Every structure is written in structure tokens, then in C-alpha cells.
Design a protein with these regions (language model features):
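Conserved glycine-rich Rossmann-like NAD(P)H-binding loop of the short-chain dehydrogenase/reductase
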Residues: 37-54
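Canonical Rossmann dinucleotide-binding motif of NAD(H)/NADP(H)-dependent dehydrogenases/reductases
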Residues: 8-42
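Rossmann-fold scaffold of SDR-type NAD(P)-dependent oxidoreductases
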Residues: 20, 92-100
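A short, basic/flexible loop-to-alpha-helix module at the beginning of a structural domain
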Residues: 1-9
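Conserved amphipathic alpha-helix within the SDR
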Residues: 55, 59, 65-69, 74-90
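Generic hydrophobic, amphipathic alpha-helix propensity
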Residues: 12, 26, 51-54, 58
Length: 102
């Protein structure tokens, strides 16, 4: 995906965006698009390897992304993720809750 392929343009330069459920199809595409707009992206997913795959793709394309394992039903895990995001990317500007369950 390239910036010219996006159906929208928005300046997210240096904004920190956190996306839960980022290892899935929809949120991983969203993460890539947001990174192309200049955001630093934290990809959270229950399966770390899924989030890491997409974070690696974003970083390989010149973006800035980190992957973190998180179960959104566990507050302590989310608090740990928040601290890591602050440490690596800075304060969160945008949160996209894409994690779901059944």
C-alpha cells in the first residue's frame, strides 16, 4: 500500500495512534493506512505474532510501529501496554478499539 492508494489524506505526522485488534484483517489495513499518513502506530493484539507481522511491514515501509500483546479484557495488561507505548512512542493521541470477541 502506498499513500497514493489511500482514499483519503490526513496529516497525522507524529501523532501516536493505538489500535486494538490490529492483528486482524481490517485493523491491520487501518494501521498501515494511518502509518502512511505519518502516525506512529502501536498495534495491540491478543496474538503478538499477528501484530508483529504488521508492525514489521509498517517499519519496512519507512513508518514507525510497535507490536504489543494485549487482552483488552485484562486491565493490568492494558496498563502495561500503555506504559510501553509512552516509553517508545509518547502520549497517545488517538485510540481505535478494533478488538472484538464472541
Amino acid at each position: 500500500m502506498e499513500k497514493k492508494d489511500l482514499p483519503f489524506t490526513i496529516d497525522l505526522k507524529d501523532k501516536v495512534v493505538v489500535i486494538t485488534g490490529a492483528g486482524g484483517v481490517i485493523c491491520s489495513c487501518l494501521a498501515k493506512a494511518i502509518a502512511l499518513c505519518g502516525a506512529k502506530v502501536a498495534l495491540l493484539d491478543y496474538k503478538l505474532e499477528n501484530a508483529q507481522k504488521f508492525a514489521d511491514e509498517i517499519n519496512a515501509d519507512g513508518g514507525k510501529a510497535i507490536a504489543l500483546q494485549a487482552n483488552v479484557l485484562k486491565k493490568d495488561m492494558l496498563e502495561e501496554c500503555h506504559q510501553e507505548i509512552l516509553k517508545q512512542l509518547g502520549p497517545v493521541d488517538i485510540l481505535i478499539n478494533g478488538a472484538g470477541g464472541n
